[in-house]
Regions:
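Conserved N-terminal phosphate-binding loop of PLP-dependent enzymes in the Aspartate aminotransferase
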Residues: 3-14, 20-484
């Protein structure tokens, strides 16, 4: 057997250390040996969110090729990507249409800014298409390079909005514990992750947090999921009253928590959050960086939960990760306030970058024209969710499956029926993640929750493979902790 593209050819070889087949790469793309790549990487590259000493001693796995939902490393091992990179490769790897869009735009207009009375066709066309795809009241978009920058931009927009409303005292932004809104200083402050805050003595002022709606880990034994979600939502009202309603600018939340564990609140949660925001005239911000562009089977995750935000943060699936780009969508009432009130003094060198905009435009057309989002809603999404629930029903260390569409988490637990978590849950999750990695599946750990978010083009047989590999890793974890 061989796997061949115009760039790389792999010839089948002996069994590899990671299982399956080990293929020998024979192309310029992998001209160095794995050992050489690792040595250079250790010598010069600081990785994100990594213990560099430990990583350099072990050596990074060098990824050299991707196609569809699969990756190949420098040793020729084929890996199925259960996380779409970092939640972003919605249309799958290797789409020639996106490469062609980037190439054409680089030849025509590789860069120009949108600062000083100038614009360009790609960003104009992208904005018009986003206005079609987003809910009816979203017709204006500000561009940046990532979700982190998008949430920084949200803060600038929120404060400018209230300045235009002659209510400058509205400075407080309420977020949630164990939320993730990026890793810039502002994004990290908005996020409620203690381990990030510990390394950030310089935090943004006037950001406060309420508890997350994590039923399995934090509900009382006599609470239903609906009662718990309602109680957690009502913490928002209590916090607004504590701060003074005239001092609160906005509430920000991911429709479902992504990096925090793919936590889906009960149906009582978001309607109550929206009711409270409207009652006190607090802007409601939906961080759609992970949930946007089809992940739940709806174009945007807030549509899955049935609420209407005032601002939405977009990234990841906007370009399927092929090039960096983020955006903030503004509800008409917010956009009109900015448009009618002079300068908005915020921007980035690459705001609305023409190549990124061209790739985003081509990517969104694929999602629309190939009906990828609809397929997630009616076919692969339900199949994925059912497959997970059937596979792990009654498993001795699985407490719950949470998710919708093509995003899910598997809660690891010492006593599933009693919702008793492992005392060393983070270690157990890391162990399970490593079993997945060694079994050539990318499955992420968030503490004791194992996360899956494959490309939206994943097929039913590929879902079967992902779930089978996940089951093998979780079985191995159960044996390792002495439960199976």
């Amino acid at each position: 057997m061989s796997y061949k593209t115009e760039d790389v050819m792999y010839a089948e070889k002996e069994t590899s250390q990671h299982g399956g087949t080990k293929d020998a790469p024979t192309s310029q793309a992998t001209s160095r040996s794995t050992a050489e790549y690792r040595a250079l990487d250790a010598a010069h590259h600081i990785h994100p969110f990594s213990d560099m000493g430990s990583l350099n001693r072990a050596g990074s796995r060098v990824i050299v090729k991707a196609q569809g939902v699969n990756l190949w490393d420098s040793e020729g091992n084929k890996i199925i990507d259960g996380m779409a990179g970092l939640w972003c490769v919605n249309v799958g790897y290797g789409r020639q249409e996106l490469a062609d869009a980037a190439f054409r735009q680089m030849r025509e207009l590789p860069y120009y800014n949108t600062f000083f009375k100038t614009t360009h066709p790609p960003v104009i066309e992208l904005s018009a298409l986003l206005a079609e795809l987003t809910p009816a009241q979203f017709n204006h978009f500000f561009y940046c390079n990532s979700g982190s920058e998008g949430n920084d931009t949200v803060l600038r927009i929120v404060h400018q909005y209230w300045a235009t409303q002659r209510q400058p005292a509205r400075k407080f932004v309420i977020a949630r514990k164990n939320a993730y809104h990026g890793s810039t200083i502002a994004g990290g402050t908005l996020g409620g992750m203690a381990y990030m805050h510990e390394q950030m003595p310089s935090k943004v002022e006037n950001i406060v947090h309420i508890d997350q709606p994590y039923f399995f880990g934090e509900a009382a034994s006599d609470q239903t999921a609906e009662e718990f979600a309602l109680a957690r939502a009502r913490q928002l009202e209590a916090k607004i009253l504590e701060l003074g309603a005239d001092n609160v600018a906005a509430f920000i939340g991911e429709p479902f928590q992504g990096a925090g564990g793919v936590i889906f609140p009960a149906d009582t949660y978001w309607p109550e959050i929206e009711r409270i925001c409207r009652k006190y005239d607090v802007l409601l911000v939906a961080d759609e960086v992970i949930g946007g562009f089809g992940r739940t089977g709806e174009w945007f995750a807030h549509q899955h939960f049935g609420f209407e935000p005032d601002l939405i943060t977009l990234a990841k699936g906007l370009t399927s990760g092929y090039v960096p780009m983020g955006a903030v969508g503004l509800h008409d009432r917010v956009a009109r306030a900015l448009i009618d009130n002079g300068d908005f003094n915020h921007g980035l060198t690459y705001s609305g970058h023409p190549v990124a905009a061209a790739v985003a435009l081509a990517n969104l057309k694929l999602l629309r024209d190939e009906r990828i989002v609809e397929r997630v809603k009616v076919d692969t999404g339900p199949y994925f969710q059912n497959k997970l629930r059937e596979t792990f029903a009654g498993h001795p260390i699985v407490g719950e499956i949470s998710g919708a569409g093509l995003v899910a988490s598997v809660q690891l637990a010492e006593e599933p029926l009693g919702r008793k978590r492992f005392a060393n849950g983070g270690d157990v999750g890391t162990m399970c993640r490593d079993f997945c990695f060694n079994g050539n599946l990318i499955m992420r750990a968030s503490g004791d929750r194992m996360l899956l978010s494959p490309p939206l083009v994943v097929s039913r047989p590929e879902i079967d493979e992902i779930v089978s590999k996940a089951e093998a890793a979780i079985d191995a974890t159960a044996r390792q902790v002495g439960i199976r």
